[in-house]
């Protein structure tokens, strides 16, 4: 039986040959500028005391729906630190946005799931991508890598694809403030169990899912050379503003479905319950969905599976049997053909179809994530090979044993109720340079990789 190390080596060689064969990926809808701040515990403690420690602690127990005060901002950051979990909230208040701006940042990077995936797939893997950018400022355009990355523009009613840097306008800056902390980061008596981040979105375009005219009026033309699509960005919507953007998303999905283009939804933490319900209602129009334990638990709550939702968040590592049960419920409820679950330490994929290529795509994705964590940025497909030196997560052995006992998993592949379940232990980078964009790297690499293995 091959070892995980052998399976990993085989998967990256396969991916290097096949990924560049993918001829076009559509990426929507959220692209922004990430202002990354590496937190300092003394500075954070001082800010918490100044804002009112008691009030801040209250918000670190339970997240607000959105941020309107400095104590809500600091409490939300503390919520993430205490759990080692990522979260993202909309910053509605201008004074809080100004506070964040004055607090500053250490670096500016490409942000938003579509933007991050565009740089990875187009700039690193060399796969042609068409990306939706709600506001294309000069600063935003310059954060795109060189390579086959395109934005559609309308010239005399005709759709023209250009690299973002060739765009002649200068629209608004959409900035998301990202507060990063390492494992063991201490604030008062609290300690982060693992590295992660909190995101405050100070942006009125991505947060309302503003969709450009080209994607509303000329969508069929925009996607004429596309083989796959990945959509994201629905997470910031609220019950007050979701209706209009959802209509546009549904009409885009109808066109993609008519052309039999597989579409992946990259789920993200969605605070609004009504929006989660609506996402669940349209999930059947997607071929695939990607999510983590917090996101899966939030969907189980909508399905009335409160006990299962609690179970998903109760253990570290996350209980794979609970995850599989939740994925089965989601697949049966929506008809989605592929569910990719990623958590710290292992990935699972539940698919209607069978084949080792599903597992191999997860292995490729885990290597891409490890390479990104190790280096901060990947510059080529070949560079991902270097991550084969990162050790496989030992804690995942107990996960694998549970899956073997329950579903007879062998070499990472098993069967459950007519579906295939694929499992892989990930590679853990002890001191990652950054955690931003790792989830997007995992999901897009797995989806594109799996498709490329069938070409």
Curated annotation (Swiss-Prot):
Pathway noted in the entry: Carbohydrate degradation; glycolysis
Q: Which GO terms describe its molecular function?
A: ADP-specific glucokinase activity; glucokinase activity; magnesium ion binding
Q: Where is the ADPK domain?
A: 2-455
Show the Pfam families listed in the entry: ADP_PFK_GK
Q: What is this protein called?
A: ADP-dependent glucose/glucosamine kinase
Q: Which residues form the active site?
A: 440
**GO cellular component terms attached to this protein's record:** cytoplasm
Organism this protein belongs to: Pyrococcus furiosus (strain ATCC 43587 / DSM 3638 / JCM 8422 / Vc1)
Q: Which NCBIfam families match?
A: PRK14038.1
Query: What note does UniProt attach to the cofactor annotation?
Result: Binds 1 Mg(2+) ion per subunit.
Q: Which residues bind ADP?
A: 195, 292, 342-343, 429, 439
* pH dependence (UniProt free text): Optimum pH is about 7.5.
HAMAP family, per database record:
ADP_glucokinase (MF_00809)
Locate the residues binding Mg(2+).
266, 295, 440
Please list which residues make up the signal peptide.
none
**Keywords in UniProt for this one?**
Carbohydrate metabolism, Cytoplasm, Glucose metabolism, Glycolysis, Kinase, Magnesium, Metal-binding, Transferase
